[in-house]
Each structure stands twice: as structure tokens, then as C-alpha cells.
Amino acid sequence: RICPRILMECKADSDCLAQCICQENGFCG
């Protein structure tokens, strides 16, 4: 999957860019 390396806070996968997923630490990855 393609995930830009940008530190983004999230609550759900939809908060993240591209194919990033929301990880347990509260950040996209």
C-alpha cells in the first residue's frame, strides 16, 4: 500500500491520506 510519510493524527482510517491506516498510537501509518 502507498502511504506518504507525513505525521498526521487520526481517529479513523478515513482521516489519513492515500492508503494509510490509523494506527494504535493515534497517528497515520
Curated annotation (Swiss-Prot):
The keyword Secreted applies. It comes from the Eukaryota. Pfam families: Squash. Its main location: secreted. It is found in: Secreted. The presence of a 'disulfide through disulfide knot' structurally defines this protein as a knottin. Belongs to the protease inhibitor I7 (squash-type serine protease inhibitor) family. Strongly inhibits trypsin, weakly inhibits chymotrypsin. This is Trypsin inhibitor 4.
